[in-house]
Amino acid sequence: MKQYDAIIIGFGKGGKLLTAELAERNWKVAIVERSPQMYGGTCVNVGCIPTKALIHESEYAEKRYYDDYKNQSKLYALAVARKDKLVSFLREKNYENVKNKPNITLYDGTASFLSENTIRIVSGKDETILEGKE
């Protein structure tokens, strides 16, 4: 069983900020995220940012090809590709901000509580048990 001062479940805005703050205070911190495709949380990956990127692209298409829906539809694949590139860039930045920091260990998998201070992480067929103080 691996021991940590704190175990943070979720690599979203709150989780990543709390993890970084505790690590700066020399706490040994584990952060758990279900999927590498969600580093940075909902806003970065499937919420605010991709939605706003697609809205921006659609507004551009409408201005450029006002009533020409055939040409607007051609820009759809390009808009999705740009959105995907932006999300991938931001996800990677979030990962880089954590991966090289001392005192932080990132785990990919589904976390569940075994007790008040004990967490089980399941990733495929692998299972890891962590114990935290806080």
PLM region descriptions:
Residues 2-4, 21-27, 33-134:
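Glycine-rich flavin
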